[in-house]
Each structure stands twice: as C-alpha cells, then as structure tokens.
Swiss-Prot record:
Function per UniProt: Catalyzes the conversion of epoxyqueuosine (oQ) to queuosine (Q), which is a hypermodified base found in the wobble positions of tRNA(Asp), tRNA(Asn), tRNA(His) and tRNA(Tyr).
Note on cofactor: Binds 2 [4Fe-4S] clusters per monomer.
Catalysed transformations (reactions): epoxyqueuosine(34) in tRNA + AH2 = queuosine(34) in tRNA + A + H2O
GO molecular function, one term: metal ion binding
UniProt-listed PANTHER family: EPOXYQUEUOSINE REDUCTASE (PTHR30002:SF4)
Organism encoding this protein: Leadbetterella byssophila (strain DSM 17132 / JCM 16389 / KACC 11308 / NBRC 106382 / 4M15)
Principal subcellular localisation of the protein: cytoplasm
Subunit structure: Monomer.
Protein name (database record): Epoxyqueuosine reductase
Binding residues for [4Fe-4S] cluster 2: 192, 207, 234, 237
Amino acid sequence: MRDYSKEIKSWAAELGFDFCGISAADFLEEEAPRLERWLNRNYHGKMAYMANHFDKRLDPRKLVDGAKSVVSLLLNYYPEEPLDASPYKISKYAYGKDYHYVIKDKLKLLFERIQKEIGEVGGRIFVDSAPVMDKIWAKKAGLGWVGKNSNLINRKMGSFFFIAELILDLPLQADGPIRDYCGTCTACIDACPTDAITPYEVDGSKCISYLTIELKDQIPNEFKGKMENWIFGCDICQDVCPWNSFARPHSTEEFYPNENLKTFQDWDEITSEIFSHLFKKSAVERTKLEGLKRNIAFVKEV
C-alpha cells in the first residue's frame, strides 16, 4: 500500500520546502478558550478581521468540505546578512519578493502533483490569507513548538520561517507534536521594548509589527522612543531567541533583497518613485509609502 504521507513530504522537499508535517483536520478544542481570551483582551488591536470567522479558525472542515488532513509546510527566509546600511530596520521576511506570491506558486505545484499522482483529491491552499491558525497546525504536525514569543520554533533551524498549509479531503498518516523546549528562558520577553510579550501570549496592539504595518492610524505617543528604529515589522523577539543560533541562510532566490535596498540610505527623502523601485512586489507595499513615511517620522521623534 502506498504511503501518501511520505510521498507528499518528498514532493514538498523537491519544491524547496524545508519541513513538512501532517495533522488530522479536527476541531482545535484546546485553542478555542485561548483565542476567545486573546480577543476579549483586545490584543488584536484594530485588526477587526481577527475577530471574524471564529468557528472557521478552529475547524478546517468549515473551510474545506470533507477535510481530513492538514499538510503544514515551512519555508526558511533567514537572510545571509542583515540590511544594515541604514539605521532604519525592516523585518527580514520583507527583504525580497512578497512571500504570498512565492509560496502560493510552490503550493499550487504541490497540489497539482498530489492530484496527478494520487487522483481525485480536493482541497485548498493557504498562505496567511484566510482564517487558519497556521502556527497551531504546524505545532500539531510536529514541526516545532509555539514559543513564549508566540512564534513557531523548530529545533533544527529556529523560527525564521513562513508557514503555509494544504487542507485536503485525503486521509493521511498524521505526525505527532513535539514538546516545548523554551524551558526557563525569557530572552524574548525581556528584550521586547514595548512590553508586548507575556509567556506564550503577545498583545498585538503593543507589538512593533502591528504598529508599523497593521495600524493605519497614528502610532500612539506611548511608544515614542521604544521602536528601536523599526520602520516595517520587527525581529527583536526572534533575534534574541537562542534557538535562532541554528538559523541558516535560505536558498530561495525570490527572497534575496533588491540590490538597491542593500545600500539605500536616503529614507528621509523617499519618494513614490523610489518606493516603487525598492519594494515592487514586496510585502512592504502593504504599508504603502505614506505608512512608511509615518513610521520613519515616528521613530525619529524621541
């Protein structure tokens, strides 16, 4: 009898995914009270969409009819070197082409391969674009544990990964979760300049990533002097994590930074033309030029 789980993992590796794990597409019973508490505390800030589709976030069968399995995939984005020509900082995941495009293309190829090799298989691909609790599914699939900074941490390569899923109506052999290896470490909690992190929970409304990307209003004055020059996203809680000493540079060409971005220093004079040149098809497009200029102006104020 064919081992479809093993074959799918092999095909995922051929497409460049670093890790692939499988879990049964069941209701996430343990997560329901946690998600409800997080929302009730308004930790989602002004990300109103986080409160939508509560039932779908917890049950993949409401996203895909007849769902039997969740295939979780990790793709490394850790760069060879940080962009440090300028004092302003951009999260490492945004150095290259927008991950949505890159991973979606790979997932489509994987799904096509599954349908070609196995037959009539229904399902959907997800790349941070629907109400899917990707870190929880990756944890259930044994790809890592959710750390105190709420990121998925993999023992072999840390946490600088994109997470994606295929939810299929195909029954597959599920992998089991691994244990938590954070131990007594509080490096991420201690390092967060806005005090957004408590053990295993992040107050999104205080997170620098939220403030520089998701928040469309003015950044509250209480965060002045606390942004540490981050103008798009933030990597502090990952940079200080001991497990990221195992991070290795990725080999995905699309994630290599724009050559002009490596040396760019004139952030205070950035124009729409320069913005388009530096960030075409980049995740930074999400914040738009005005958002980036707002962030730059805010971090300059002390």
